[in-house]
C-alpha cells in the first residue's frame, strides 16, 4: 500500500483553527434572510467546521471541505437557546455535549425529553423530530455531526413556516426554503 505525502501546505487545508470559525447566520442576509429569522430556526450561533466538497444549502459556508456525506458543526447556545423541532429523513444527526447541559426533546410535539450533560452523546434516528436547548446558566457548546449523502434534508412543520411568514414575511420564508437546507414540510406526504 502506497501512502501520500501532502506536506505542511497540503495539511494546512485540512486543519480548522478556532480563529477560522465563522458563524453561518450572517451569510444569508444578502439572500433575503435576516439573521434573526435564521436564528429563530437554529441555534443562536452555528459554526460549520467541515462539510462535503459539494456542499450546498446550509452547509455551503464551511471552514474546511471534507469527504462526501460528513458535516461537523459546533452549536453555541446562550442559556435557553436551541433550534426549533425539526427532522432529518436521510441523514443521521449526532449530538455530543462539549460544554454545559442540553435538554434533548423528540417526538412530533417534543413530548419526550432527556438531558445531555458534558461529554454525553446521542445519535438521533432518521425521521425522528428533535430539538435541543441549553438548560444551563452559561453559554454551552454542542458538537453536531451529520452523516449521510443528502444533507439538504432539514424539515420543519408547516406551522413553523407559517410562524416565520407571520413574523418576517412570506418572502423570507420562501428565501429560507430556496437558499438553505431547511424546508417546511414535516407532516406532508
Residue ranges of model-derived segments:
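A short beta-strand-loop-beta hairpin characteristic of the jelly-roll/cupin
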Residues: 82-85, 90-118, 128
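Residue-level recognition of conserved beta-strand positions in structured domain cores
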Residues: 74, 87, 106-108, 134, ...
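Conserved GNAT-family N-acetyltransferase fold
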Residues: 75, 95, 122
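Conserved short histidine dyad/triad with adjacent acidic residue
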Residues: 51-60, 73-88
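A short, N-terminal "cap"/entry segment at the start of jelly-roll beta-barrel domains
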Residues: 1-69, 174-189
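Double-stranded beta-helix
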Residues: 2-8, 131-189
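Conserved metal-binding segment of the jelly-roll/cupin
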Residues: 78-80, 116-136, 145-147
Amino acid at each position: 500500500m502506497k501512502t501520500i505525502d501532502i506536506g505542511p501546505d497540503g495539511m494546512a487545508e485540512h486543519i480548522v483553527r478556532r480563529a477560522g470559525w465563522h458563524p453561518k447566520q450572517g451569510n444569508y442576509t444578502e439572500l433575503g434572510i435576516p439573521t434573526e429569522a435564521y436564528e429563530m430556526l437554529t441555534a443562536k450561533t452555528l459554526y460549520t467546521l467541515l462539510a462535503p466538497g459539494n456542499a450546498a444549502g446550509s452547509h455551503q459556508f464551511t471552514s474546511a471541505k471534507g469527504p462526501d456525506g460528513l458535516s461537523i458543526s459546533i452549536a453555541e447556545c446562550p442559556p435557553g437557546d436551541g433550534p426549533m423541532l425539526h427532522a432529518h429523513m436521510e441523514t443521521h444527526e449526532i449530538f455530543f455535549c462539549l460544554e454545559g447541559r442540553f435538554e434533548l426533546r423528540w417526538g412530533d410535539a417534543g413530548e419526550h425529553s432527556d438531558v445531555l450533560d458534558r461529554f454525553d452523546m446521542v445519535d438521533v434516528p432518521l425521521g425522528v423530530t428533535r430539538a435541543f436547548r441549553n438548560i444551563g446558566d452559561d453559554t454551552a457548546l454542542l458538537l453536531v455531526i451529520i452523516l449521510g449523502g443528502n444533507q439538504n434534508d432539514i424539515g420543519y412543520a408547516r406551522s413553523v413556516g407559517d410562524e416565520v411568514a407571520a413574523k418576517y414575511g412570506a418572502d423570507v420564508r420562501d428565501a429560507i426554503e430556496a437558499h438553505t437546507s431547511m424546508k417546511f414540510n414535516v407532516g406532508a406526504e
